[in-house]
Curated annotation (Swiss-Prot):
Transmembrane segments: none annotated. It comes from Danio rerio. This is Large ribosomal subunit protein eL42. The keyword Cytoplasm applies. Component of the large ribosomal subunit. GO terms for cellular component: cytosolic large ribosomal subunit. Belongs to the eukaryotic ribosomal protein eL42 family. Keywords: Cytoplasm, Ribonucleoprotein, Ribosomal protein.
Amino acid sequence: MVNVPKTRRTYCKKCKKHQPHKVTQYKKGKDSLYAQGKRRYDRKQSGYGGQTKPIFRKKAKTTKKIVLRLECVEPNCRSKRMLAIKRCKHFELGGDKKRKGQVIQF
């Protein structure tokens, strides 16, 4: 379980100094219908003949690398950058901090 705080003081390239940054998890955008590969694939698929390209079924990884999106909180900067961290099964953003000697409650 990886727990990351919602704010982080780190270097901002635009401000050229350390600033507080808002942390969110990166999400992939929707695929464009007009990308060259998608247009070619759709053209090939149309008409008779069934599936024309192999469907990938041999997945090797069980997790994805977590990518953090850091946004500078300076009102007239707001520059954004990505920061990749290691692979993990469970990722949490701004969860409760772990305390020493605390009894686990269920």
